[in-house]
Swiss-Prot record:
Native organism: Clostridium novyi (strain NT)
Listed name of the protein: Small ribosomal subunit protein bS21
Region described as Disordered: 35-60
GO cellular component term of the entry, any: ribonucleoprotein complex
Protein family membership: Belongs to the bacterial ribosomal protein bS21 family.
Recorded name of the encoding gene: rpsU
GO molecular function, one term: structural constituent of ribosome
Keyword Ribosomal protein in record: yes
Example GO BP: translation
Amino acid sequence: MSEVKVRDNESLESALKRFKRSCAKAGVLSEVRKREHYEKPSVKRKKKSEAARRRKSKVR
């Protein structure tokens, strides 16, 4: 869990901006989206191989 303490003479907006940045860096939102619905292991493998195929074709 990301934790941000508001510093002296710091506006709430800048503290919120730091909190959002720390959450994005920690990958909190992407993890939540990934775990929103159950995904069968076979579907995970299929998505992973398709992503690798796309990356490989992008390089060429």
